[in-house]
């Protein structure tokens, strides 16, 4: 099952986008619909709202007077938090019931108005944000929903900012134009990204990126942070730390080209802990690569942990690796044991290359040579680089020893 979190500001067009995805074949779980369901007359949700905000939020027939509740609940932050504290747990429980009832190979789009504000984005393998300019949203709310302009502005101001939404968005769909334009964009995203992603997940396949160096993408840091947040959530207590590593983690050098693949390292206390992550990471969008079980061992393995320093035990280079099923964001997820040489070198390598422009230039030259000689074959690309890495391992640790580096 591929679960997609969908959100956007009030008036941006969440319902329209949900409808477009439903026409494509998605199962829609609408947070607004559920939010109404859990506060119907006779529910514990409505009783809790009355206790918190008073009986004057009820209509004569005992149902919820939504404008009256909104006037109180959006008056200040404390009132809004009270509202969210009552409604969100009930909505979450009902959402879980619905999702548990659908087929396992479904694409489930969860329309959640406050996905960003409630910190739920890392729970989803993919987050879609529908966007419209504030003035466009304001006009829709006033003209189509009959809101007073002051109320509409207050509702907009009470929600997350565009910057906060961008920070969690894997896909950003502009709905400032016509309904037909939004439908076209939704269908394109569905066919080019969502369907392949769902297929890869159901078959436990990964999305492979071309073996091609590209200029640094200014979006890499933000993309990596979203992945880190997602993996921390999926790994829970098993992850001692989660880091952006590899070439895309190097800051500030506009000439340092890299493959368009994000590398992430999850540090765990043991390989047994890594093996407990197979299903949680699959659910998060990252199937395991069963055929890769170790890094290439280096002689005189080094570590800042004394019992692992200057060792020759090849078992200390064992690891687990997962990769993204999302064709829109190829990612490698290396799971290594805390203090083992491979875990330490992944962290050291980024810091060393960041600090040493000559080493950075050397590595770029090796990568360009490997790209040319590999002719699109990832195994050949890795093999061409390996002799350089054997020497780089020693150079990096010489730098670490001279600077007092710690992970």
Swiss-Prot record:
GO molecular function, one term: dephospho-CoA kinase activity
DPCK domain: residues covered: 3-201
A cellular component annotation (GO) from this entry: cytoplasm
Locations listed in the record: Cytoplasm
Function: Catalyzes the phosphorylation of the 3'-hydroxyl group of dephosphocoenzyme A to form coenzyme A.
Family: In the N-terminal section; belongs to the CoaE family. In the C-terminal section; belongs to the UPF0157 (GrpB) family.
Annotated protein name in UniProt: Dephospho-CoA kinase
Annotated organism of origin: Mycolicibacterium paratuberculosis (strain ATCC BAA-968 / K-10)
UniProt gene name: coaE
């Amino acid at each position: 099952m591929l679960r997609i979190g969908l959100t956007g500001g009030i008036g941006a067009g969440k319902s329209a986008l949900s409808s477009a995805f439903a026409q494509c074949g998605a199962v829609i779980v609408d947070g607004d619909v559920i939010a109404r369901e859990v506060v119907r007359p006779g529910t514990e949700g409505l009783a809790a709202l009355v206790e918190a905000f008073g009986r004057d939020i009820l209509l004569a027939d005992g149902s919820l007077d939504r404008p009256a509740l909104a006037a109180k609940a959006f008056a200040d932050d404390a009132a809004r938090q009270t509202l969210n504290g009552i409604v969100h747990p009930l909505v979450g429980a009902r959402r879980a019931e619905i999702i548990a009832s659908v087929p396992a190979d479904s694409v489930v789009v969860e329309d959640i108005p406050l996905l960003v504000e409630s910190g739920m984005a890392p729970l989803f393998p993919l987050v879609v944000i529908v966007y419209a300019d504030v003035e466009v949203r304001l006009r829709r709310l006033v003209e189509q929903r009959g809101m007073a302009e002051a109320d509409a502005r207050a509702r907009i101001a009470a929600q997350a900012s565009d910057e906060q939404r961008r920070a969690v968005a894997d896909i950003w769909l502009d709905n400032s134009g016509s309904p037909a334009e939004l439908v076209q964009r939704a269908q394109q995203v569905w066919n080019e990204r969502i369907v392949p992603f769902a297929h890869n997940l159901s078959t436990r396949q990964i999305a492979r990126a071309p073996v091609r160096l590209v200029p640094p993408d200014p979006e890499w840091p933000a993309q990596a942070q979203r992945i880190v947040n997602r993996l921390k959530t999926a790994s829970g207590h098993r992850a001692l730390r989660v880091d952006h590593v590899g070439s895309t983690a190097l800051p500030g050098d506009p000439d340092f080209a890299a493959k368009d693949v994000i590398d992430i390292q999850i540090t765990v206390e043991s390989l047994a802990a890594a093996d407990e992550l197979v299903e949680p990471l699959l659910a998060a969008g990252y199937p395991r690569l069963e055929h890769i079980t170790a890094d290439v061992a280096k002689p005189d393995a080094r570590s800042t942990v004394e019992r692992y320093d200057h060792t020759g035990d090849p078992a200390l280079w064992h690891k687990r690796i997962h990769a993204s099923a999302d064709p829109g964001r190829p990612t490698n997820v290396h799971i290594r044991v805390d203090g083992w040489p491979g875990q330490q070198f992944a962290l050291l390598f980024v810091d060393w290359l960041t600090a040493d422009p000559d080493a950075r230039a050397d590595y770029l030259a090796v990568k360009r040579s490997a790209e040319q000689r590999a002719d699109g074959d990832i195994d050949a690309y890795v093999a061409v680089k390996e002799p350089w890495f054997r020497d780089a391992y020693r150079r990096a640790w010489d730098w670490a020893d001279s600077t007092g580096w710690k992970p």
